[in-house]
Structures are given as C-alpha cells and as structure tokens.
C-alpha cells in the first residue's frame, strides 16, 4: 500500500517540523510526503527548500501557493497534486496533527485484513484525540489555548 501524506501549513513552522518528524518516524512510512505551504511568511518556504533536499526514503513534494487559500484550498491543491503521484491512498492532515507512530501501519493492517470489504472502502480515518489523549474528540471542531503551559480544549460555537 503506497500512501501520500498531504499536510497543509500556514505560519506554524514549529508545528510543521514536529509533524514532518512524526511521518519520518512511522512504522509504515508514506511513499510521498506532500506539504502545501499556504503562502506562509514565517520562514516556512525557506525551511521547505532545505527539507525537500534532505535524504529520506520518503519522496518529498512541496506545493507553494501564491496566496493563503485557507485549509480547504490547501487540501484541494494537495489532493490535486497527490492524484498525479503513484499512490494507493491519500492521507490528509493539518500541520498541528501528530499521528501516532503506527497510524499508517494500522490503516494498512485494517485494509489488508478485510479483503471482502476492499471494493467498498473509499475512505478511512483515524481517531482524533485531545492533547492529553484522555478522550476521543467526536466533534473535533475545537479551539485550544495554552494556560500556564497546559492545552485547554474549548468547543467552537456553531455560528463560527
């Protein structure tokens, strides 16, 4: 199973660095790691030029957008590029989402262990946990902020 992981980023270079490291540490690494830079102004473009040249068994692809198209626009650009690549699955993620080391392997194991369902499986997703991993976020439309070093999750009002 060849996977292309698409990560959309905007002005969160430190989050992006942490996310990229998490994909390098996967027990089942993606074939492609595709980063969509949503016109960041915090040094992300310069960092990605260097990152793209670093040796890795993962093929690195960077898409630099001329303007910030938001999350949806970034994922659209990433999916378009990913569909041009030789991969079986596309994994999408924000720059502040950090997959567990076996996330991609778990997806592969699930798919491979259910051959009778494979023709009907069009999408799979992981579980979204809060920062402390104490509970599953079912409606993960949340906002977080740090108070004295502790991440506090707060639901975003529906009107937002």
Where are these regions (language model features)?
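Acidic helix N-cap motif at the loop->helix transition within catalytic regions
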Residues: 42-51, 102
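Glycine-rich, basic loop-to-helix element that forms the pyrophosphate-binding segment
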Residues: 65-82
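Conserved donor NDP-sugar-binding/catalytic core segment of glycosyltransferases
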Residues: 102-138
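Short, acidic, metal-binding catalytic loop of nucleotide-sugar glycosyltransferases
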Residues: 21-30
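A conserved acidic beta->alpha catalytic loop
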Residues: 37-46, 67, 97
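Cell-envelope/extracellular polymer assembly enzymes that use nucleotide-activated donors
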Residues: 2-4, 32
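Short, flexible, basic/aromatic active-site loop/helix in glycosyltransferases
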Residues: 143-160
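Short beta-strand-to-loop acidic/aromatic patch adjacent to the donor-nucleotide binding site
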Residues: 87-96
